[in-house]
Design a protein with these regions (language model features):
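Bacterial Sec-dependent N-terminal signal peptides
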Residues: 1-9
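C-terminal motif of bacterial Sec signal peptides marking the signal peptidase cleavage site
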Residues: 16-20
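Exported/periplasmic ABC-transporter solute-binding proteins
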Residues: 22-35, 39-314
Length: 314
């Protein structure tokens, strides 16, 4: 009895196999087409889910703090800063903006929030966020250099009058040398040709402080300079541009860092700027945000609070 049941099962399996092999080309094609159609339908259904973004969401505005050179340059270049009836410059950044006190703070805030927008030094841009094009122009060393990307500013070395400290004089000469400017370019900034340089090997300690945007480049320059002149000690303190300038004038810093032009009042107080390099200001959004381009007027509207949702800039 067991042998008979096995024989029946084998025969049934063989019949099914022969039926499948004997399928007509038309039925096979139809079956294949049905499978393909089903796969295409599934893919079409899944595609929007992968890029789903609600444009009606409120924009989370991320800004730098008062005193930041990046903020100062950004609001000037975008028109967020404007003169009032008395002719005084006023920063019209929306009060709803979330304030971050460093470049890394802005990067973290934007990367963790799909509705956020921020601005940072181009040299600090990484893959955690997306830089939008401005007026259709992508931020890069080349577009900053040729002027087609308009959100750009200088990185300044600041001293109290002419530098007098031997280490400061030698270090600044290194920064402006062929090697120093090449390093700036390698780090993603826009350096100059640079001058010939031979270290005088001075000994002593200086303190360099200021802008958090300039700080990453300055750190690289200090590391490189120490290999040229091991006799010197350089301490780097990262704060902001305004503190960088005031620190030089009150003696806290030997050299200041500012990621903006000096104010008239600072120059009148004795501050002297030397352009270390040029840098773009990248406007950044989350990698999950489909927005790829903004106009300067749209950026201004977002930061003054006139445009409040992502639908307003589509």
């Amino acid at each position: 009895m067991l042998k008979r049941n096995v024989s029946v099962a084998v025969a049934a399996a063989l019949a099914l196999s022969l039926a499948a092999c004997g399928s007509s080309p038309a039925s096979s094609a139809a079956s294949s087409e049905a499978v393909s159609s089903e796969a295409a339908s599934s893919e079409a259904t899944a595609a929007p889910a992968a890029g789903d973004f609600d444009v009606d969401q409120d924009i989370t505005v991320i800004s730098r703090e008062d005193g930041s050179g990046t903020r100062g340059a950004f609001i000037e270049l975008t028109g967020v800063e404007a003169k009032n009836d008395a002719g005084e410059k006023v920063d019209n950044t929306t009060e709803a903006a979330a304030i971050q006190s460093s470049t890394n703070g802005v990067l973290t805030a934007v990367s963790n929030d799909e509705t956020a927008i921020g601005y940072i030094s181009l040299g600090s841009l990484n893959n955690d966020v997306k830089a939008v094009t401005v007026e259709g122009v992508a931020p890069s060393a080349d577009t900053v250099k040729d002027g087609t990307y308009t959100l750009a500013r200088p990185f300044n070395i600041v001293t109290n009058g002419e530098a007098a400290d031997p280490v400061a004089v030698d270090f600044i000469a290194y920064c402006m040398s062929t090697d120093g400017q090449a390093l700036a370019t390698e780090e993603g900034y826009i350096g100059d040709v640079g001058a010939d340089y031979t270290s005088t090997q001075p000994a002593g300690k200086i303190v360099v402080g200021g802008s958090s945007s300039v700080s990453p480049l300055m750190e690289k320059l200090i590391e490189a300079y120490k290999t040229v002149n091991p006799n010197a000690t350089l301490e780097l303190q990262t704060t902001d541009s305004t503190t960088g300038v005031s620190g030089v004038l009150d003696g806290t810093y030997t050299i200041g860092m500012a990621s903006r032009e000096l104010k008239d009042s600072e120059v009148e107080g004795g501050a002297k700027a030397t352009v270390l390099a040029k840098d773009g200001i990248a406007v950044i959004v989350s990698n999950d945000n489909p927005t790829d381009n903004l106009t300067v007027d749209q950026i201004k509207g977002i930061y003054t609070g006139e445009l409040t949702t992502w639908a307003d800039v589509q």
